[in-house]
Amino acid sequence: MTDPSAHSAALTYGSYLALDELLSAQRPRSEEHDELLFIVVHQVYELWFKQVVHELAYLQERLHRGEGGHALATLKRVLTILKTVVSQVDVIETMTPRQFTAFRSRLEAASGFQSAQFRVLEAMLGRRDERMLAPYPPGGPGHARIAAAMAAPSLFDSLLRYLATQGFAVPPVPEAPAAGWRPPSEAVQRVLLDVYRADGEAALVCERFVDLDEGVQEWRYRHVKMVERTIGDKPGTGGSAGAQYLRTTLFTPAFPDLWAVRGAL
């Protein structure tokens, strides 16, 4: 005999996606119509950041195994997600400065500056900066995840490891400074020139890394322009300098060696 309770517990679209929890996670703090859009857009960003971090961790595994084909497929997915992330700025820009100002005070000290997932992404890209930990209580999940990402090999470390599996003589590379990104290395650039001149799969992987770097920089640019058009030069809600701070993050490549070799090709 079939247990009647089995039907009530059967998996559904809603239960599989946890839609009851997901759709109840938007809790505006004002009666302003536009606050819901603000919340939804930022929650969607966080979901995409989660997926990008997930894919980049998988990418590192493939690179460590020397699996260039799998790495290229994963990079294609990440790049497609980044294009979606950038395009979502168009949605938030339908909100006028007046519409945002109407509920901005209700955000109190909450700020995108506090996005732990984006800090993890930055750490995976190679940023090593203990100041990134400041907004997160020691012992908390955000603090632990960012610290672990900064202690782990960066994406560029994984790329160099992959190149070594392909027979290229990868030299030791300098460590990133205590507050910043790893400096360029002429020794690494000589190896990258060999990679590009061989014009094989490894060169394609390097090119997709350039696309990744460019995609993140494009996101940063669209983000700062969105902030400028919404709040001008006002300070950020979390105490940051707002657009002024965001401008300082522009045009800093995560993989400077891949850019430096282009003039010598």
Curated annotation (Swiss-Prot):
Membrane spanning residue stretches: none
Protein's pathway: Amino-acid degradation; L-tryptophan degradation via kynurenine pathway; L-kynurenine from L-tryptophan: step 1/2
Principal EC category: oxidoreductase
Keywords, alphabetical: Dioxygenase, Heme, Iron, Metal-binding, Oxidoreductase, Tryptophan catabolism
Recorded GO MF terms: heme binding; metal ion binding; tryptophan 2,3-dioxygenase activity
Cofactors that this protein relies on: heme
Binding site for substrate: 38-42, 104, 237
UniProt KW Iron keyword: yes
GO biological process: L-tryptophan catabolic process to acetyl-CoA; L-tryptophan catabolic process to kynurenine
Co-factor note (free text): Binds 1 heme group per subunit.
Record-listed heme binding positions: 223
Entry EC no(s): 1.13.11.11
Catalytic activity line of the entry: L-tryptophan + O2 = N-formyl-L-kynurenine
Protein's job: Heme-dependent dioxygenase that catalyzes the oxidative cleavage of the L-tryptophan (L-Trp) pyrrole ring and converts L-tryptophan to N-formyl-L-kynurenine. Catalyzes the oxidative cleavage of the indole moiety.
Family, similarity comment: Belongs to the tryptophan 2,3-dioxygenase family.
Subunit structure: Homotetramer.
Protein name in UniProt: Tryptophan 2,3-dioxygenase
Organism: Anaeromyxobacter sp. (strain K)
